[in-house]
C-alpha cells in the first residue's frame, strides 16, 4: 500500500503539519562517514527499505533549511532502495518553503562548502522541479507592513523601509503588569546568558524544583544522540522572575 510521507526540516515545523522530521523519516542523522558509504549502510535498514518502497509522494516543508548534503543523500537513498535511477527513485517530491528565509545550518566538520542551498545541487537540476509561487498573503492585511516585509525579504533597504522600522525602534509600551518585553536570540546559549543575568539581579530568595520525567521511546540505530544538556532537570525561580 502506497502512502504520502509528510516531513519538515525541524521538529517544530513538522509538528504543525502532522508529520516528522526529514532526518527521522529518512534515517539520515549526523555522520562523518563518506556519503556513499553512509547511504549504503542506511539503505540496509528494514524499516527504511519498507518506508521508501511504499512511498508514493514525499513532502518536505521548510526546504530552505535542508543542507545540500542531506538533499543529495535523500535523492541517492531513494534510488538505491527502489532500484530506480530516476530522480528520487521515481518518488513524487513536493518541496515547500522560502529560500529568502532561514538557510541551512551547515555541518561544522565539513570545512569546505561548495554549495549553501540545495537548489545549487546537480540533483535539484536533474529533478526538473516546477516552481509555484504563491502570491496571496493571508497573515497580514496592513498594506504598508506587507510592502516593508517584502522589501526586507529581498534585501532592499530604501528610505520608506527604514522609516517604518525606525518608527518602531525602542517604542515605549504600557507596562501595566511589570513584565519586560520578550527578547529573541539566534542561539539557546545567548538566551540562557541573558536569562541568567536578569535572574541574578533579582534579590529575592531562590527556590529550586527538581523533576524526573520518564519517557518511553522506540529507538532505531540513532546516529544523532540527544545532547546530554538539551534540557535540565532543575528549575530555578524567584518571586518577580519571568518564566
Region roles according to the model:
Residues 1-243:
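Conserved ATP-binding/catalytic motifs of P-loop helicase motor domains
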Amino acid at each position: 500500500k502506497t502512502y504520502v510521507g509528510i516531513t519538515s526540516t525541524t521538529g517544530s515545523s513538522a509538528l504543525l503539519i502532522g508529520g516528522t522530521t526529514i532526518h527521522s523519516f529518512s534515517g539520515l542523522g549526523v555522520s562523518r562517514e563518506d556519503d556513499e558509504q553512509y547511504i549504503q549502510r542506511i539503505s540496509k535498514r528494514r524499516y527504511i527499505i519498507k518506508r521508501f518502497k511504499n512511498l508514493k509522494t514525499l513532502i518536505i516543508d521548510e526546504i530552505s533549511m535542508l543542507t545540500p548534503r542531506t538533499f543529495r543523500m535523500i535523492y541517492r537513498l531513494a534510488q538505491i532502495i527502489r532500484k530506480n535511477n530516476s530522480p528520487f527513485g521515481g518518488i513524487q517530491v513536493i518541496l515547500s518553503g522560502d529560500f529568502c528565509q532561514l538557510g541551512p545550518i551547515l555541518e561544522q566538520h565539513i570545512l569546505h562548502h561548495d554549495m549553501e542551498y540545495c537548489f545549487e545541487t546537480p540533483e535539484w537540476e536533474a529533478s526538473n522541479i516546477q516552481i509555484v509561487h504563491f502570491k496571496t498573503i493571508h497573515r497580514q492585511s496592513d498594506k504598508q507592513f506587507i510592502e516593508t516585509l517584502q522589501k526586507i525579504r529581498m534585501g532592499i533597504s530604501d528610505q520608506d523601509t527604514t522609516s517604518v522600522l525606525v518608527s518602531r525602534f525602542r517604542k515605549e509600551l504600557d507596562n501595566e503588569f511589570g513584565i519586560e518585553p520578550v527578547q529573541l536570540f539566534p542561539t539557546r546559549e545567548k538566551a540562557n546568558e541573558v536569562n541568567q543575568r536578569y535572574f541574578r539581579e533579582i534579590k529575592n530568595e531562590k527556590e529550586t524544583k527538581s523533576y524526573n520525567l520518564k519517557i518511553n521511546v522506540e529507538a532505531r540505530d540513532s546516529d544523532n544522540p540527544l545532547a546530554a544538556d538539551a534540557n535540565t532537570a532543575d528549575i530555578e525561580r524567584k518571586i518577580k522572575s519571568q518564566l
